[in-house]
Design a protein with these regions (language model features):
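Outer-membrane beta-barrel biogenesis signature
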Residues: 3-23, 29-38, 189-214
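Outer membrane beta-barrel
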Residues: 14-32, 36-149, 153-188
Length: 215
């Protein structure tokens, strides 16, 4: 497999408290050995429209909608409040497990995140989170719903909890050394007919191309 990645970020932000933006990610690959006649492939792996509103007293809200794979999916819809070094957030958002997931995917060096971050990534969930950040220390905790936002009487809902901590002994302009640890607790949903709850982990690897091109 020879992979070539094309991250294209398209944004159009307006001045003022209301900002609109978007992005388009194209992932391509040249497969030297597979069972398909086509060995080169490119896909639009992510396309989004984003709206952000900054309100007085450090209130902030964001709505992010994705349109990749011929589907409309909600990516983010949350309200955030900041008090000095403290940040509170509630809504539909990332269930973060590691410090890397604090950064926007627009800032990733590669198309995907690190395998550890991708594997233990909760996905987006309805929940609440708290973050404390200053020059030397950072900590964040979150509590989120289970595997879905809608339930019926046949499903016993689960929940998820995350915790992250970072110590930055060196954090100056052009210089950074940080040491971090992250924790994840998962209690997945369970149908009442089943006895066990099932936890699954997966990762995108180095590309977002469809799995069929890997075979």
């Amino acid at each position: 497999l020879l992979a070539f990645l094309f991250p294209i970020i398209v944004s159009a932000n307006t001045d003022g408290p209301v900002k609109l933006g978007g992005r388009l990610f194209i992932d391509g690959g040249l497969f030297t050995k597979n069972s398909y006649s086509t060995h080169a492939k490119a896909e639009i792996t992510d396309i989004r429209l984003t709206g952000k509103i900054t309100l007085p007293d450090e209130w902030y809200t964001k709505i992010d909608v994705g349109f990749a794979s011929n589907k409309v999916s909600l990516k983010d819809a949350f309200v955030q409040k900041k008090w000095g070094n403290n940040n509170f957030r509630i809504g539909y958002m990332l269930g973060m497990c590691c410090i890397e997931q604090s950064a926007s995917t627009n800032d990733y060096v590669f198309m995907t995140g690190a395998n550890a971050a991708e594997t233990f990534y909760l996905g987006r969930r309805v929940g609440v989170s708290y973050t404390f950040s200053q020059n030397k220390y950072y900590c964040s905790a979150g509590l989120f719903c289970g595997d879905g936002a809608e339930y019926d009487d046949k499903v016993l809902p689960g929940y998820n909890a995350t915790l992250r901590g970072v110590f930055r002994p060196l954090n100056e302009a052009g210089e950074l050394l940080h040491l971090g640890v992250g924790g994840l607790f998962r209690r997945p949903d369970r149908e009442k007919e089943q006895k066990d709850r099932l936890v699954t982990f997966s990762s995108n690897g180095v590309t977002g191309l469809s799995l069929r091109y890997w075979t």
